């Protein structure tokens, strides 16, 4: 996995502080704080840690952890890596500003197959609107007043307009949508693990259900080009962090040398150095054995009392 992206790079934007705000529609949104500062970084340098953190946020929901614990984990992830870029991830193209409307393939969040551009943008700017004018396929966007936002716009001026817009401080993503995406990734991992762990215990119909579930996992492959830096480097054109995570997760899922595993004790996702590793740490292994031993002792004590 690391070797695959060793000579690769990409760019994404994260802010140093995020908050959860409630919009007029009653929905909760994650958005940068008013005075938060943006930072441009290369997500491929942190690919393994990012995917593991995303999966473990999802596992909190799979294991029905308290809502405040889940909320804290989601905000921590977003502060580490930025929002998912759902605005550019959901449409058929991240360049939707160049079209008369926004066209949407089937997804978890929006039922409509197409939307007016203004209505679609409103889903991601529930608090402060950007100064955008849209007429047919023509669109213009005026950025003024905030030097940081102007600098971000200039940095990504060759990217699709919508991607650059999603890096602005006004941008927000629905909390429930972000949470659902983390849960979907965790569900995909557990489906894969259960399929192989329980293969001999389940019938062929159940196996087919697992296979169908995994076949639904996928995405549009990102484009890339080669840059001649100190050595030839692949630059991945991720137009959303979601797409980047999806691709990195896919490679990690099929990696036989360092497979993804679920800790038998704490249910935490970890990268294993061996295919048969069952615990994320020596501490978890020891605790598991202690609890297992106590359980046996209780059973024996109960039998003796009988």
Can you say where each PLM-predicted feature lies in the sequence?
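BZIP DNA-binding basic region
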Residues: 245-306
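Short helix-coil boundary/hinge micro-motifs
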Residues: 1-270
């Amino acid at each position: 996995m690391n070797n695959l992206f060793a000579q690769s790079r990409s760019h994404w934007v994260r802010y140093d502080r995020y908050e959860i705000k409630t919009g007029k529609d009653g929905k909760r949104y994650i958005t940068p704080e008013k005075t938060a500062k943006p930072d441009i970084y290369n997500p491929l340098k942190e690919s393994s840690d990012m995917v593991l953190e995303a999966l473990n946020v999802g596992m909190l929901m799979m294991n029905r952890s308290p809502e405040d614990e889940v909320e804290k984990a989601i905000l921590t992830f977003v502060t580490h890596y930025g929002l998912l870029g759902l605005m550019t991830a959901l449409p058929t193209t991240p360049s939707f500003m160049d079209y008369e409307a926004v066209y949407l393939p089937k997804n978890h969040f929006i039922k409509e197959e197409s939307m007016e551009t203004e209505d679609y943008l409103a889903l991601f700017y529930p608090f402060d609107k950007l100064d955008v004018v849209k007429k047919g396929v023509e669109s213009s966007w005026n950025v003024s007043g905030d030097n940081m936002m102007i600098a971000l716009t200039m940095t990504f001026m060759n990217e699709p307009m919508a991607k650059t817009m999603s890096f602005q401080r006004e941008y927000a993503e629905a909390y429930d949508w972000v949470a659902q995406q983390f849960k979907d990734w965790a569900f995909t991992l557990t489906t894969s693990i259960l399929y192989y762990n329980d293969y001999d215990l389940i019938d062929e119909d159940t196996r087919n259900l697992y296979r169908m579930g995994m076949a639904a996992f996928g995405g549009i492959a990102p484009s890339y080009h080669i840059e001649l830096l100190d050595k030839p480097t692949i630059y991945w054109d991720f137009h959303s962090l979601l797409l980047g995570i999806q691709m990195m997760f896919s490679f990690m899922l099929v990696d036989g040398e360092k497979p993804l595993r679920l800790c038998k004790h704490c249910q935490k996702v970890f990268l294993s150095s061996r295919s048969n590793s069952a615990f994320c740490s020596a501490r978890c292994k020891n605790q598991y054995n202690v609890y297992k031993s106590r359980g046996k002792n209780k059973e024996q004590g109960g039998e003796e009392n009988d």
